[in-house]
From Swiss-Prot:
Oligomeric and partner information: Homodimer.
DNA-binding region(s) from the entry: 33-52
GO cellular component: cytoplasm
Gene name of this polypeptide: fabR
PROSITE patterns per the UniProt record, alphabetical: HTH_TETR_2
Molecular function as annotated in GO: DNA binding; DNA-binding transcription factor activity
Name listed for the protein in its UniProt record: HTH-type transcriptional repressor FabR
Organism of derivation: Citrobacter koseri (strain ATCC BAA-895 / CDC 4225-83 / SGSC4696)
Length: 210
């Protein structure tokens, strides 16, 4: 990569980080102004268009980055699990770490999931689908259950995790710890339910084939 390309990438990065830093519990992406984001990144507003077509393109890049960040973290969690950690507890603590360290990235995913822009809703849905698919792959490998079961289990788990994540954004450390314990219990119940359901289906099939 040439010096000019490196500089361009660095400025693009600064714009993404500037936009993330301006999000908060009170401030959504829709309320950000191009001028403010450019000022925070240290560039002239007119220079913004060398990096992004418009503010929406910046927002879609942020959605992609948020989803990718979360998926990479969960892959790291699976590596920690491979070294002997508890699957559900390690995954939950990794997810809560993500929210603690990147609250605005998670806020963006939550808000735009049901926001007014169809492009944003589609982008968030795609990121969540990637997340579900990766979890279903892992469950299929670990639990030796058919894809239909692991996909249903993964979808239920991700729905509950995102709901708990939304709560975790606005509570203190002690409440977050309680939330984590509740989430671990709920995910274990789903995992056990999926396993017993699968066993029951297997027994039914065996019974019919006799």
């Amino acid at each position: 990569m040439g010096v000019r390309a490196q500089q361009k990438e660095k400025t693009r990065r600064s714009l993404v980080e500037a936009a993330f830093s301006q999000l908060s519990a009170e401030r959504s992406f829709a309320s950000l102004s191009l001028r403010e984001v450019a000022r925070e990144a240290g560039i002239a507003p007119t220079s913004f268009y060398r990096h992004f077509r418009d503010v929406d393109e910046l927002g879609l890049t942020m959605v992609d980055e948020s989803g990718l960040m979360l998926r990479q973290l969960m892959r790291q969690a699976r590596q920690r699990i491979a070294k002997g950690g508890s699957v559900i507890r390690t995954s939950v603590s990794t997810f809560m770490e993500f929210i603690g360290n990147n609250p605005n990235a998670f806020r963006l995913l939550l808000r735009e999931r049901s926001g007014t822009s169809a492009a944003f809703r589609a982008a968030v849905a795609r990121e969540i689908q990637h997340f579900i698919a990766e979890l279903a792959d892992y469950l299929e490998l670990e639990n030796h259950m058919p894809r239909a079961f692991t996909e249903a289990q993964a979808e239920a788990m991700v729905t509950i995790v995102f709901s708990a994540g939304a709560e975790a954004l606005d509570v203190g450390a002690e409440q977050r710890r309680q939330l984590e314990e509740r989430l671990v219990l709920q995910l274990r119940m789903i995992a056990k339910g999926a396993y017993y359901w699968y066993r029951r289906e297997q027994e039914k099939m065996a019974h019919h084939s006799e």
